[in-house]
Structure formats: structure tokens, C-alpha cells
């Protein structure tokens, strides 16, 4: 019953031919994909993200949650990959946010990750589950794989630029299922 989580935080620099930095930016995020929704887990994860954001700008949580919900959308299925979180990219220096401010923000979000996720793991790791629930988990993991291989910009970039394939695919779950035209029973937990 432990949900899947995704997290990364990054910094990019571009250089000219002389080795001078000509552009730089931060990006990253963290999001949660439960197979069975426990409202208190969702609230805890999102509140932890919001608390981290609010320390830097009270508008960041709403903005970056919306970006997360938009980015992690499985368009071919018309469904979200999970319950969201934060997603931000191209965070460049402005009058209001110097690169040091962005570094502090990204560090705050990154440092909040364990606080957001570990309590959920601790609560759910020993919850018993049935064979039917395991099947549902693997079907949902299949949707996670679909997103990564069809929509995820980082995965697609790696695949199209001769990246290290094993490293790129290592983030995919080891056991998944696809059931043709599967629809959960109306009113079920799924």
C-alpha cells in the first residue's frame, strides 16, 4: 500500500566556447502516485510541499502544484499519473529571485522530501493487501510506465540522444500489467 514517489532537483548551466556561463536555471519537483488513496497521506504530502514553498513565496505552492498536475497528465488516457505535488522548471534569476534564492528554494523543497514521504511509507508499509489489490497496483504501475515512455521529457530526451538506456529505464517499476480496456468496478476502492 506504499505509494510510488518521484523526485528530482536539478541545476543546469550552459557555456560559450570560452567556458563562460551564458545561461543557468534550476528545476525539479516531487510527486506522489498512490494506488489506493488515503486522504490523510495526500494531505500530509501536499501540506509538507506547501510549507516548504511558503517559506520562499506564498504563490509558489499553487503555481508549482498546477504545473505538476499539468505535466504529469497521461493525455492518451485522459488521467493524472498520480495526485500531484510540485513541478518547476526554468527557474532563472530575476529581480525578485536571484540564483541564490532559487538555490535556497530548491534546497528547501528537496530537504522537505523525506518529511513528506517517509511518514507515508511508515504508515503503509505493513498494511496487508490482497491479490486483487496487487493486480490493481501493477495496472497503475503500467500507467506510470506509459507516462514515462510517452510523455516524460527527460526520458524522451535520454532515449533520443543516445543516453545510457539502462540508467534511463532503471526508474521504471519492475512489475507492471496491462489489461485490455480495463475499467475498475463503479464504486470500488480502485
Regions found by a protein language model. Give the residues of each.
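Extended, compositionally biased non-globular segments
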Residues: 99-156
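Aromatic/basic-lined ligand-recognition segments
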Residues: 8-9, 27, 69-94, 142-149
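Internal mixed beta-strand/loop scaffold within catalytic domains of large alpha/beta enzymes
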Residues: 1-25
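Extended active-site and interfacial segments that coordinate phosphate-rich ligands
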Residues: 10-11, 25-31, 169-172
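TerminUS-proximal long segments
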Residues: 155, 159-190
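Compact, glycine/acidic-enriched structural inserts
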Residues: 17-67, 183
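Generic recognition of stable, solvent-exposed alpha-helical segments in well-folded globular domains
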Residues: 44, 48, 59, 63, ...
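A generic structural motif
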Residues: 15, 33-40, 90-105, 153-155
